[in-house]
C-alpha cells in the first residue's frame, strides 16, 4: 500500500459514492484528508478524515475551506475533484428525461453538471494551485469519464466531462514549470450506493469506491508522477501498473472506449 504519511489531501463531493471512497482510501494510506460535501457528517468517517460541510457552488464557502486547510496544516499536497450534479431527478413527470435529446433537456441539468461539476472543479483547483505553486509540489486529480470522448446518452454530460478533460490538459500546461501535476482519472463501474440500489448492473467487473482512492494514493506516492502531467488515466489500468487491488483482492479489468 502507498505511504502518504505527512501528506494532506482535499476531496470534494465526499458525502457518498466515489468521493467518500477516495477520502477513505487516502486516509488508509496515511494522508490527512479534508472531505467536503453538502450533507457530509463527521460521524460517518474514522480517524484521519476531517469533514467540512460545503456547497461547491458557493465561492465564499469554497474559499473558507481552503483557508481552513491552510490554517490547520500549512500545506496541501492533493486535490481530488469529485463534486458533481445532474444525476438527481432523472425521471420527471413520469418521463426519463436524462436521456432526452438536448433540445428537450431541462436547463437545471446543465447548471448542475457544468456549475456543480466543471466550474466547481475549476474554482477548487484555483485555490489549490495557489498553495501548491508556492510549495512547488502537488497533485490535482479531476474525476472524469469516457463521455468526454464518446456519446453516452446525454449531451450535457458529454460537454461537462469534455470540459473536465480539457481543463486538466490546459491546467497541466500552466502548472508544469511549478512542480504541480494535474491528471484526469476515469473510474469504471463503481459500486456506489446508487448503483447498488438500482440492482440492474452487471457487477462482475465493478470497482469499489475505495479502489479509486487506492489508485490515487499510488499516483500520489509515485515520485515520477509528473511524467503523467496532463494525461487522461483509466483507474483500473493505473492499478495494474502499480499492483493495486480492490478491497476484495480483485484486479478490475480496465475499460476502453470500445467497452462503454
Residue ranges: model-predicted function:
Residues 8, 15-16:
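Conserved glycine-rich cofactor-binding loop
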Residues 47-60:
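Rossmann-fold cofactor-recognition segment
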Residues 7, 75-76, 97, 132-144, ...:
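Active-site loop of short-chain dehydrogenase/reductase
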Residues 29-44:
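Conserved glycine-rich Rossmann-like NAD(P)H-binding loop of the short-chain dehydrogenase/reductase
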Residues 184, 201-260:
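C-terminal helical subdomain
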Residues 125-126, 169:
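A short, exposed helix-loop element centered on a Lys and neighboring polar residues
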Residues 85-86, 99-109, 139-163, 168-177, ...:
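Catalytic loop of short-chain dehydrogenase/reductase
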Amino acid at each position: 500500500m502507498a505511504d502518504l504519511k505527512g501528506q494532506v489531501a482535499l476531496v470534494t463531493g465526499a458525502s457518498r459514492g466515489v468521493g467518500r471512497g477516495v477520502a477513505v482510501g487516502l486516509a488508509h494510506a496515511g494522508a490527512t484528508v479534508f472531505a467536503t460535501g453538502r450533507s457530509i457528517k463527521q460521524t460517518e468517517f474514522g480517524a484521519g478524515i476531517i469533514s467540512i460541510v460545503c456547497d461547491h457552488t458557493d465561492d465564499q464557502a469554497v474559499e473558507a475551506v481552503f483557508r481552513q486547510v491552510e490554517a490547520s496544516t500549512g500545506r496541501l499536497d492533493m486535490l481530488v475533484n469529485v463534486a458533481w450534479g445532474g444525476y438527481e431527478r432523472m425521471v420527471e413527470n413520469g418521463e426519463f428525461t436524462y436521456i432526452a435529446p438536448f433540445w428537450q433537456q431541462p436547463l437545471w441539468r446543465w447548471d448542475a453538471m457544468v456549475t456543480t461539476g466543471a466550474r466547481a472543479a475549476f474554482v477548487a483547483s484555483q485555490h489549490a494551485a495557489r498553495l501548491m505553486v508556492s510549495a512547488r509540489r502537488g497533485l490535482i486529480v479531476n474525476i472524469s469519464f469516457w463521455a468526454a470522448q464518446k456519446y453516452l446518452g446525454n449531451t450535457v454530460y458529454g460537454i461537462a466531462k469534455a470540459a473536465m478533460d480539457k481543463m486538466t490538459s490546459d491546467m497541466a500546461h500552466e502548472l508544469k514549470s511549478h512542480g504541480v501535476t494535474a491528471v484526469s482519472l476515469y473510474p469504471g463501474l463503481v459500486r456506489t450506493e446508487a448503483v447498488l440500489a438500482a440492482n440492474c448492473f452487471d457487477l462482475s467487473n465493478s470497482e469499489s469506491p475505495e479502489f479509486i482512492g487506492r489508485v490515487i494514493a499510488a499516483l500520489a506516492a509515485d515520485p515520477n508522477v509528473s511524467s503523467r502531467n496532463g494525461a487522461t488515466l483509466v483507474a483500473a489500468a493505473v492499478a495494474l501498473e502499480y499492483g493495486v487491488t480492490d478491497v476484495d483482492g480483485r484486479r478490475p479489468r480496465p475499460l476502453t472506449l470500445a467497452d462503454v
